[in-house]
Amino acid sequence: MAIVNQPRTLAEKVWSDHVVVAGTGEGAAREPDLIYIDLHLVHEVTSPQAFDGLRLAGRPVRRPDLTIATEDHNVPTVDIDKPIADPVSRTQVETLRRNCAEFGIRLHPMGDVEQGIVHIIGPQLGLTQPGMTVVCGDSHTSTHGAFGALAMGIGTSEVEHVLATQTLPLRPFKTMAVNVDGQLPPGVSAKDIILAVIAKIGTGGGQGHVIEYRGSAIESLSMEGRMTVCNMSIEAGARAGMIAPDETTFEFLRGRPHAPKGAEWDAAVAVWRQLRTDEGAQFDTEIYIDASTLSPFVTWGTNPGQGVPLSDPVPDPELMFDEAERQAAEKALAYMDLRAGTPMRQIPVDTVFVGSCTNGRIEDLRVVADILRGRRVADNVRMLVVPGSMRVRAQAESEGLGEIFTAAGAEWRQAGCSMCLGMNPDQLAPGERCASTSNRNFEGRQGKGGRTHLVSPAVAAATAVRGTLSSPADLAAEPTH
């Protein structure tokens, strides 16, 4: 990280504003900085042992007012008025409820009007704000970086440390700029941008870095789109992803329940406007992407970096020069039951999942509804549409989107992480293939033996209608009903 009197990147500014005690030493021997944490998000999976640690040490939660909890990973998305059937999931949810009650932490339980995926409720409540440090025991905490916050996932022992001290010892990260300039072609979205970025730099390309996404294409994105991009930073190996706040950010936050009001709002915005990378600041790494060259993207393998444009065929491992890459591709194709050279558009799916902290927001649901309106989900396809929060669900209902989903033959569910991960009832059966708007396509991620293709909401909707991986352009010649 840069010293204060030099031009600084956005990440360096936020970092330096939160140093409680600076580490001493140089290079690898340098001690960590002690960083103050502004917002701590908690869910049922990674928190039980952390609370047990507090209990054993006789410690309280230092700042319960800066801590918020929700139930998202393990909760069902149907019959939410009934007890959770799976005993492990039920125990984790019940344990979170007891811990929050004991330690005085706000909790939005299943069915609550503000319940939802942790990375969706933070922004929608206005808790996530520019210049903050945000942590959660979840990989995709980088979502909140869309607001110009330094947000990162942490482990259970670190969760306990933050609960006890509201601080975290961290070593400074390297910085990377991902510049995306130009105009996106029609039908190309934020999800396609980030899938293309990961395919370009690889799943380890951002290791040890905070990525700042910059350029005209990024600035043109809505906050929902920016959250999608930052959400998947971890899939490129990065510690966090950030986008400088601007008028789009401020308008999204204005009037949110926990956003500043009145004179405090004006003062906050004045500070937030300074949260930009200085002219002349140096990044450790920098890459450039021409947005006008992008097209709908889809993964073919078992990590998010194994992706290609939808118009391409399945890659041939024999054409890969790197031996490790070739072996990984061969293993992935075997698991995915795909043959090299098969056009991506000819790959049939059994299931389509729309949701997750990547693409479970109202903008995503509107895109899907626009495509499904007047059309039917293919007879051989099961489609789940799962809102990222109860507030998103209520908004979708008020706009008539739920009726469009059900009329098309999709299942319109309650809020939760759902099929993003195999920790709740929404799972793939062995051998089932899914086009998913989520963020990970690892082996077994959506259920043991399940096969996942990561796609944008638009591609997911078109795929549901046609039954094979498709883009909205493929539907143009097909009539609606």
Curated annotation (Swiss-Prot):
One of its GO terms (molecular function) is metal ion binding. Keywords: 4Fe-4S, Amino-acid biosynthesis, Branched-chain amino acid biosynthesis, Iron, Iron-sulfur, Leucine biosynthesis, Lyase, Metal-binding. It catalyses: (2R,3S)-3-isopropylmalate = (2S)-2-isopropylmalate. [4Fe-4S] cluster binds at C357, C417, C420. Its EC number is 4.2.1.33. Its cofactor is [4Fe-4S] cluster. Binds 1 [4Fe-4S] cluster per subunit. InterPro entries: 3-IsopropMal_deHydase_lsu, Acnase/IPM_dHydase_lsu_aba_1/3, Acoase/IPM_deHydtase_lsu_aba, Aconitase_4Fe-4S_BS, Aconitase_4Fe-4S_dom, IPM_dehydratase_rel_enz, IPMI_cat. One of its GO terms (biological process) is L-leucine biosynthetic process. Pathway: Amino-acid biosynthesis; L-leucine biosynthesis; L-leucine from 3-methyl-2-oxobutanoate: step 2/4. Catalyzes the isomerization between 2-isopropylmalate and 3-isopropylmalate, via the formation of 2-isopropylmaleate. HAMAP family: LeuC_type1. PANTHER family: 3-ISOPROPYLMALATE DEHYDRATASE, HOMOACONITASE, MITOCHONDRIAL-RELATED. Heterodimer of LeuC and LeuD. Belongs to the aconitase/IPM isomerase family. LeuC type 1 subfamily. This is 3-isopropylmalate dehydratase large subunit. The lineage of its organism: Bacteria, Bacillati, Actinomycetota, Actinomycetes, Mycobacteriales. The gene is leuC.
